[in-house]
């Protein structure tokens, strides 16, 4: 069967469902698919198709995730749903499914539960920028006051983790009833879709961001100077642009005097392209793999940060034994490994394979980083963990 042409005309937004086990995340995902395809066309996915999430591997970590797509009149959405709590943790930490916004599902029969809190905390740590709340199973609650109470509780919980709890949209509905085709509950799903459209801003495309290129290789070309190669992560670099070399050593400034791709000279290199950038007056030994080339002032080097980390289980090829404070692995950022030490939260003596944990990392040399940067934890080239920079300390 021929693949359908990907519709490029509408803005593309990535979302996902989060929340406590059995609160109805997958049912809601199916309901959104059902109601939006019924209203705006497309192909609906049913509960069983979504629930039977295929296994994926991201950086050697096994994650079960379901991907579905749906449209509103103005946007195209890619939506991820995970069957198990561990899958959410891994998904959010590895950034396997980057979310521009999340739909937090809370059963109004239960109110916020332990995983509700944990998913909100994870969203904060990994930088999910926007959360919309869907209060599910409202058909099972007769008492208006009880619904108000649950809504208040959820809003307070979100505020506790620095989300705008008082202002974000909360929709009260029933995923199951909408899936069964009851008009009053289907209307709530359309209300949720409108909230997605209006509350989650259009994500910035990679090409519109500040230029950054993680350096993979350095060559010296006689008579021309030094060329660094790598894939442009975001932004555009043009011939004549001033750039900074950031990380590992002191930051230096230079000028891009040429861009080449597949041995051809270009005027610019754009996000997603593998290219070589010729640097004016830079010596071969002044720049190395692991540094980044960036728009001046857009990124700074750091050595200490708070992170959220998932430790691979033995089955995923991770460690077979726990680690303790004083653990000194390598932290792999973009293109290079840097040794670092860890500080565990108070009261935590050891970390078991398969755990997720908040830890403070101190690197032996600075790396160009922003909050939200992903990294791997390695021992002798073998990945034993995945993490994300939650907060820069120094």
Swiss-Prot record:
One of its GO terms (molecular function) is guanosine tetraphosphate binding. Residues 19-26 are annotated as: G1. InterPro entries: EF-Tu_GTP-bd (IPR041709), EF-Tu_GTPase (IPR050055), EFTu-like_2 (IPR004161), EFTU_2 (IPR033720), G_TR_CS (IPR031157), P-loop_NTPase (IPR027417), Small_GTP-bd (IPR005225), T_Tr_GTP-bd_dom (IPR000795). The keyword Transferase does not apply. Residues 174-176 are annotated as: G5. Residues 81-84 are annotated as: G3. It is an enzyme of class 3 (hydrolase). One of its GO terms (cellular component) is cytosol. Monomer. This is Elongation factor Tu 1. It comes from Shewanella loihica (strain ATCC BAA-1088 / PV-4).
């Amino acid at each position: 069967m021929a693949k359908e042409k990907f519709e490029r005309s509408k803005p593309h937004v990535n979302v996902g469902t989060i929340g406590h086990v059995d609160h109805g995340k997958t049912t809601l995902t199916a309901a959104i698919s059902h109601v939006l395809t019924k209203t705006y066309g497309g192909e609906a996915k049913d509960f069983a198709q979504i629930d039977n999430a295929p296994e994926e591997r991201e950086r050697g970590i096994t994650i079960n995730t379901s991907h579905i797509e749906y449209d509103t009149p103005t946007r195209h959405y890619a939506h991820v749903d995970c069957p198990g709590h561990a899958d959410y943790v891994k998904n959010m930490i590895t950034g396997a499914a980057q979310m521009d916004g999340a739909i937090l599902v809370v059963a109004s029969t239960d109110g916020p539960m332990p995983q509700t809190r944990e998913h909100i905390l994870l969203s904060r740590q990994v930088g999910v920028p926007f959360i919309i709340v869907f209060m599910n199973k409202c058909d099972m609650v007769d008492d208006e006051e009880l619904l108000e109470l649950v809504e208040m509780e959820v809003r307070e919980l979100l505020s506790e983790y620095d989300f705008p709890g008082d202002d974000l949209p909360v929709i009260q509905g029933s995923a199951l009833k909408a899936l069964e085709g009851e008009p009053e509950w289907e209307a709530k799903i359309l209300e949720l879709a409108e909230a997605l459209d209006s509350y989650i801003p259009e994500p910035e495309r990679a090409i519109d961001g500040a230029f950054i290129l993680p350096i993979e290789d350095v060559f010296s070309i006689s008579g021309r100077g030094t060329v660094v190669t790598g894939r442009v992560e975001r932004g555009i670099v043009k011939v004549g642009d001033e750039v900074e070399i950031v990380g590992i050593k002191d930051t230096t400034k230079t000028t891009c005097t040429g861009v080449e791709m597949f041995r051809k000279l270009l005027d610019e290199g754009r996000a997603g392209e593998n290219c070589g950038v010729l640097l004016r007056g830079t010596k071969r030994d002044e720049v190395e793999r692991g540094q980044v080339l960036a728009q001046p002032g857009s990124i700074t080097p750091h050595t200490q940060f708070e992170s959220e980390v998932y430790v691979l289980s033995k089955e995923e090829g991770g460690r077979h034994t726990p680690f303790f404070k004083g653990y000194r692995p390598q932290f792999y950022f973009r293109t290079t490994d840097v040794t670092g030490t860890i500080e565990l939260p108070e009261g935590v003596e050891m970390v078991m394979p398969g755990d997720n944990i908040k830890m403070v990392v101190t690197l032996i040399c600075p790396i160009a980083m922003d909050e939200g940067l992903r990294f791997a934890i390695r021992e002798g080239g073998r990945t034993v963990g995945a993490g994300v920079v939650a907060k820069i300390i120094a």
